[in-house]
UniProtKB/Swiss-Prot annotation:
Region feature (Disordered): 306-349
Record keyword Signal present: yes
Basic and acidic residues composition bias: residue spans: 306-316, 326-349
Alphabetic keyword roster: Signal
Signal peptide: 1-25
Name of the protein in its database record: Uncharacterized protein MJ1397
Length: 486
């Protein structure tokens, strides 16, 4: 052949995986959901919608929620997902403030590790039509609505709620890029022919790519492997690799490679309402319910009477009140006569329905409605509370405090304890229901959480309740507790 050089240029377009951010349209998941006022929900469908059109893209891989999808080419598509509930719950409760006024408490609980903005459209007839509320992570918010209606039955209709939950999705997809193989030869001194192949892979995109490449040649039907290589090719750069073989036959050089980039997109999960056979995306349904709370006239008279008596009494110091009650307690222990059935019924009625209050104290109604429906109906007193008890909302006491608290002192869990403590102090652990009630009182009426816990214990078990917060003291008095401010 002599000293000759042949140069062959082969340009081949192959499939590869690369990323271009502007290729993606909107991607979101929607769930057909119905929330119920008891905190439950049903989700009938979960779907992933991809609004994606790019004529150059193909071989798209999507990984989301332990599911993988392959799209041979770009298109708008909706993919089915396993139904999954939201980490959100909604509870609705109500109380009757007076003969003509109701209160509804719309509680949104966010169990996600991030804050979520909720937009709610309420049924007609209430003082609030629409509301927006940002609920912090692992927390809740209560929206209080009111309605003027003189009826024992209140119907709170269906409401709509909208929100967006962030989520992560992984995408890997393909575009064409060029590569080239330059082949040449030369005659060696021994008369043999040496063939050289120079491979060039070019990244003509504006992002870096991961590349795996395999090189080989076929000579006289025999395959010769040059090896497998991995690269990271930066934008608008290329990699080259050269290999030599000696053969009197003309070799054919081959290259197989793929390049990819994994992209993690932030998408939104939205609720959806089913209408006929389709869904309205972005809105979820919250089912309504009816409340039946009778109004008792005698309760209004009793509360007014107590209020007038309280206003006519001269204020006295806590220590004087305690001395008076100590004498009463001593005389009660000497009496063997049990209270009559009428007296027991009267006490039960007063504790069961402390709901109708004066206009000045309407703010107490929500707490009373919640407590009466959850705790007051359980009137069996555990052994530790069968004697006259002292319930306090703190664990740090002064010498003067200890003089007032001559018996066993019960402190709700969560109170910080000081160095000086009563001799018979007992820490009381609240149930989950009682903790929820205390949190509701704390948030709705802006009173200390430990004071709210003490009020809950006082309502449930009876006894004297000592409170260190004036606002909490006012709430306890209006509920009907034997409360003291200290």
């Amino acid at each position: 052949m002599g000293t000759m050089r042949s140069v062959y240029l082969i340009i081949i377009i192959i499939l590869f995986f690369a990323f271009i951010s502007l290729s993606f349209g909107e991607i979101y998941e929607y769930r057909g959901v119905v929330f119920y006022p008891n905190g439950s929900q049903t989700v009938d469908v979960s779907k992933l919608h991809i609004d994606y059109e790019n004529p150059d893209a193909f071989s798209i891989y999507i990984s989301y929620r332990n599911s993988s999808f392959y799209l041979p080419y770009s298109k708008n598509i909706t993919l089915n997902l396993p139904p999954k509930k939201f980490n959100i719950s909604i509870t609705i409760s109500a109380s009757r403030i007076s003969r003509d006024e109701w209160r509804v408490y719309y509680k949104i609980i966010n169990n996600y590790p991030y804050s979520i903005l909720f937009n709610i459209s309420f049924p007609g007839g209430f003082n609030i039509k629409n509301a927006s509320v940002l609920v912090p992570a692992k927390s809740y918010k209560i929206i209080t609505l009111s309605k003027i209606q003189n009826s024992n039955i209140l119907y709170f209709g269906d409401s709509n709620i909208s929100f967006e939950v962030p989520a992560k999705l992984m995408i890997r997809y393909s575009l064409p890029i060029p590569f080239s193989i330059i082949k040449s030869n030369k005659i060696l001194s021994n008369g043999s022919i040496e063939w050289t192949a120079i491979y060039i892979i070019k990244n003509d995109k504006n992002v870096s790519l991961n590349v795996n490449a395999s090189y080989w040649a076929v000579v006289n039907n025999t395959k010769i492997d040059f090896g497998n290589y991995s690269y990271i090719i930066e934008p608008n750069e290329n990699v080259s690799q050269s290999f030599n073989i000696t053969s009197d036959y003309v070799p054919i050089f081959y290259l197989k490679f793929y390049a990819w980039r994994d992209v993690y997109e932030t998408i939104k999960i939205k609720p959806a309402i089913k209408v006929d056979n389709s869904y309205i995306i972005g809105i979820g349904k919250v089912e309504g319910l009816s409340f039946n709370i009778p109004y008792y006239n005698y309760m209004e008279r009793e509360i007014k009477k107590k209020k007038e008596e309280k206003e006519n009494e001269e204020s006295s110091k806590t220590i004087n009140q305690m001395q008076r009650h100590k004498k009463e307690e001593k005389s009660q222990t000497q009496e063997t006569k049990k209270p009559s059935k009428n007296e027991m019924n009267k006490q039960e009625k007063e504790r069961k329905y402390p709901l109708i209050i004066e206009e000045k104290f309407k703010k107490v109604a929500a707490a009373i409605a919640t407590v009466t429906t959850t705790s007051i109906t359980a009137m069996l007193i555990p052994p530790i509370f069968r004697r006259r008890s002292y319930i306090v909302d703190k664990g740090i006491f002064s010498i003067k405090d200890l003089e007032l608290l001559s018996g066993t002192v019960y402190v709700p869990e969560g109170c910080k304890l000081g160095n000086i403590l009563p001799g018979g102090i007992t820490i009381i652990k609240l149930t989950d229901v009682e903790k929820d009630l205390a949190r509701d009182l704390h948030e709705i009426y802006d009173i200390p959480l430990n004071s709210a816990k003490a009020i809950i214990l006082g309502v449930k078990y009876g006894g004297r309740v000592f409170l260190s917060d004036k606002k909490a003291y006012d709430v306890a008095v209006e509920i009907g507790l034997e409360a003291y401010l200290f």
